[in-house]
């Protein structure tokens, strides 16, 4: 019996520059549609924004908190409190404390 080779792990991504699906040329305050997946964009001057719906009003683009790149849902986010991220499948994540432990949770439920 021979050993099965281990699958290669993706390279770490700890900032917006390596995050897939960030939409260019977004207008701050403009309407947007999806507040759950691939929510990030950049303005013409390079500011990172995200599509959000405060208090369930119509979604629009807001200035983004600091972004930690691509992270796994429900993984520890110690050191990234109040930051946002994106899961490998595009889910919007935010670092939330749950029972005293910081974890990456859904950003559209924060």
Say what each PLM segment does.
Residues 8-55:
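Extracytoplasmic low-complexity, Pro/Thr/Ser/Ala/Gly-rich segments
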